[in-house]
From Swiss-Prot:
Gene3D superfamilies: EF-hand
Keywords of this entry: Cytoplasm, Meiosis, Membrane, Repeat, Sporulation
Role summary: Plays a role in meiosis and sporulation.
Entry GO terms, CC: cell cortex; cell cortex of cell tip; cell tip; cortical cytoskeleton; cytoplasm; cytosol; mating projection actin fusion focus; mating projection tip
Record-level Gene Ontology MF annotations: calcium ion binding; enzyme regulator activity
Subunit structure: Interacts with myo1 and pik1.
Induction: Five-fold increase in meiosis in mei4-dependent manner.
Presence of keyword Cell membrane: no
Main location: cytoplasm
Family listed: Belongs to the calmodulin family.
Domain EF-hand, residue spans: 6-41, 75-110, 111-143
Protein name as catalogued: Myosin 1 light chain cam2
Disruption phenotype: Cells are viable and complete sporulation normally at 28 degrees Celsius, but form four-spored asci poorly at 34 degrees Celsius. In sporulation-defective cells, the forespore membrane (FSM) is formed abnormally and F-actin localization is aberrant. Only fragmented or anucleated FSMs are formed and F-actin dots remain at peripheral regions of mother cells even during meiosis II. Sporulation defect is alleviated by overexpressing myo1 from which IQ domain is deleted.
């Protein structure tokens, strides 16, 4: 979903505040602070990638595009979390791996045993019997 007018206005306002020289650019080293001021979490790896791609500064158009993409990712992440919460009966943030495998085989689009096994390995790489679905969602969204 595209950014709302309110979100777009907030992004532009934040850009202007951080454009100290008023040259239409902000240092890529400040992008993390700008995003956090907008309530958007970003990893150091994402910031490093952005800096490698753009160099020392980012213009408003690229900034707006980056933030809009980040907002879409965040919305998708929240949708996944909501879906997992349905199966988190005790609100612990964890789901039993065996139950997860059963859900994957029986609900929605039926997955093959091999597909389910791959998903389970990704969800519970240490084979502990349960997994933190917040962490799982962040890992799959990062791919």
């Amino acid at each position: 979903m595209p950014a709302s007018k309110e979100q777009t206005d907030e992004m532009k306002e934040a850009f202007v505040l951080y454009d100290i020289d008023k040259d239409g650019l902000i240092p890529t080293s400040h992008v993390g602070s700008v995003l956090r001021s907008l309530g958007i979490n970003v990893t150091d790896a994402e910031l490093a990638k952005l800096s490698n791609e753009l160099g020392d500064a980012i213009d408003e158009k690229k900034f707006m595009s980056f933030v809009s993409n980040k907002l879409r990712e965040t919305e998708s992440e929240e949708e996944y979390i909501k879906a997992f919460r349905v199966f988190d009966k005790d609100n612990s943030g964890y789901i039993e791996t065996a139950k997860f495998a059963d859900y994957m085989k029986t609900l929605g689009e039926k997955l093959s045993d091999n597909e389910v096994q791959l998903m389970v390995q990704e969800a519970d790489p240490t084979n502990s019997g349960s997994f933190d679905y917040y962490d799982f969602v962040q890992r799959i969204m990062a791919k």
